Design a protein with these regions (language model features):
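Long, charge-dense low-complexity segments
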Residues: 1-193
Length: 193
């Protein structure tokens, strides 16, 4: 029974995206402790400043999976590219308890859960990209199998204005946490537009 409860807690932990976005919002504009190292100060809003802000926020998020991320940025053009390692379907539980406490086989849902998780994570990475520097106007997010240099699963492009008026609202009102997207990740992707 403890294993079933643990699986259910895990599934619930994969639906806290609005809380993660709130954390990103609180971190936005915070001082960057890595901008000065050994007395050398990086340019505010420069490559080093933006990249260290991005990675600091990513590393401080409390996600159910460790996520390796790489980022490239060109502050002069406002472009950012992010690649992250998406979890594998085998990392999701094979069974969760139903309303009667009996284990329900969910092996067939793992691929959908993985896709929905990766899409939500891609949107959160874009949110972080826009939060670390107001000069970032476009974020391309690439989900890869397992590691940032793994096989490409998908790539999404976000621009600041559209993100603010569509995807950011999904975080703000909690819609992105809705379990309906777990059974139909394509519906979540459509909600980003």
């Amino acid at each position: 029974m403890a294993e079933q409860e643990s699986a259910l807690d895990f599934i619930e932990a994969t639906h806290l995206w609005s809380q993660h976005a709130q954390f990103v919002g609180r971190a936005e504009g915070a001082p960057n402790p890595f901008r000065t190292i050994y007395g050398v100060e990086a340019q505010p809003g420069g490559v080093w400043d933006v990249m260290t802000r991005f990675h600091t926020i990513c590393e401080r998020l409390q996600l159910p999976f460790h996520v390796s991320t790489s980022v490239e940025v060109n502050p002069a053009t406002g472009d950012m590219a992010v690649a992250f390692g998406a979890p594998e379907p085998t990392q999701f539980p094979t069974a969760v308890p139903d309303s009667h406490g009996r284990a329900r086989d969910c092996t067939g849902k793992r691929a959908q859960w993985t896709a929905a998780y990766a899409l939500r994570l891609a949107a959160l990475r874009a949110d972080i990209g826009f939060a670390v520097n107001t000069g970032i106007i476009g974020v391309t997010v690439i989900a890869r199998a397992g590691e940032p240099d793994g096989q490409t699963l998908f790539s999404l492009g976000f621009n600041r204005v559209d993100f603010h008026f569509t995807t950011a609202k999904l975080f703000a009102d909690g819609t992105i946490d809705d379990a309906q997207f777990d059974v139909d990740p394509a519906q979540l992707l459509a909600a980003f537009d």
